[in-house]
């Protein structure tokens, strides 16, 4: 099982120390082993189905990163496409430091309808096309798109 944990560590190294339940399951590690690691402090549950390997520094924007990983829990960061979710609206503005809007929820835009049970996650339906960039390791809408999204939602981006 050591090779399974090596694979989990390798995935987590590329994902800010985070790994999803589905990614762990792909390695063949038994869920009882994962539960034991949570119990002894080797893993920390940061969101439903998202865990952080202990020992490293906590990544900035941890909750946002965990929410983004939940959108496509089987896919590693390097395998993801914009169709699987792009940080947008207030969350994107917060990452850029634009405006004074509270980023008290995590907002993402996806081309297809998707639902979440999380009350702090808002999923917007739309096609971002090429109006996104990588920012701090996350796909994030460009400032011009942020302004358009916020104005369409009757928010003052200023």
Predicted regions and their residues:
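Short gly/ser-rich loop at a beta-strand->alpha-helix junction or flexible surface loop bordering the NTP-binding
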Residues: 1-158
